[in-house]
A protein has these predicted regions:
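ABC family nucleotide-binding domain
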Residues: 15-222, 229
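H-loop (His-switch) and adjacent beta-strand-loop-beta switch element
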Residues: 226-239
Length: 255
């Protein structure tokens, strides 16, 4: 088993550090550990795919990184912030300002326009000035994901792939430290998934750090680093050259 990188790592200090991360859920049969002790470093500008079967711990780890849930034990350090020590109010503020989250199911507000959905995190964090200034930024972000022409439409008026682009723009609203994406292409057809994935690749090229949980082994083969999780433990940590050599492990994963 490997909880750290086997290959060369980017220069500089890690952006995200996980130390002994565990998460247990109480069940009638006793505590069930979804994460069993994760040690991990993620560096600025990396595009990391967390690959694993359903129930392996992917979403749990994403929720820990995004501040949606708390660990049972261990430490989470992101850009020098001890996330595991934050109060509930502090965690909510930190998450709203510093993390961009993209879910499989879009989670857009149906009665708000695409632009208004992108404005929500700005309003929550009290950033980017007056509503007209927030609207201008929302349009800029929608242009970044090539959907500005739909800014004033309701989510129901655009396609699934376009809704996911709106969700990505919303995740970028407060210029987050990193983006946590949980199966962001899981509900899309392959062509639309490729288009959404290309948006992520462009964001990484511009310097963003992305941590993406997926069961799509083909998409996972196109990132800068692949982690494989099984039964709450990271069992492989591969960078590009190693990922090619270790591809036989990836092809065993269930779609």
């Amino acid at each position: 088993m490997s909880n750290g990188s086997n290959g060369s790592r980017p220069p500089g200090e890690p952006l995200i550090v996980l130390e002994g991360l565990k998460k247990a859920y109480r069940t009638p049969a006793g505590d069930f550990y979804a994460l069993k002790g994760i040690d991990l470093e993620i560096y600025p500008g990396e595009f990391v795919a967390l690959l694993g079967r359903s129930g392996a711990g992917k979403s749990t780890l994403i929720n820990m990184l995004a501040g949606i849930d708390r660990p049972t034990a261990g430490e989470i350090w992101i850009a020098g912030q001890a996330v595991h020590k934050l109060s509930e109010a502090g965690l909510t503020r930190w998450r709203g300002r510093e993390v961009g989250v993209v879910f499989q199911s879009f989670q857009l507000m149906p009665m708000l326009t695409c632009a208004q959905n992108v404005m929500l995190p700005m309003d929550f964090a009290g950033r980017y000035g007056l509503p007209r200034q927030q609207y201008a930024r929302a349009r800029e972000l929608l242009a970044t994901v090539d959907i500005a022409e739909h800014a004033d439409k309701l989510p129901s008026a655009v396609s699934g792939g376009q809704r996911q682009r709106v969700a990505i723009a919303r995740a970028l609203a407060n210029d987050p430290i990193f983006i946590a994406a949980d199966e962001p292409t899981g509900s899309l057809d392959s062509r639309t998934a490729d288009a959404v994935f290309a948006v992520f690749q462009q964001l990484v090229a511009e310097g963003k750090t992305i941590f993406m949980a997926t069961h799509d082994r083909e998409l996972a083969s196109r990132v800068s680093r692949v982690l494989r999780i099984e039964d709450g433990l990271i069992v492989e940590d591969l960078r590009p050259a190693e990922a090619q050599e270790g591809r036989q492990h990836v092809v065993e994963m269930e779609a």
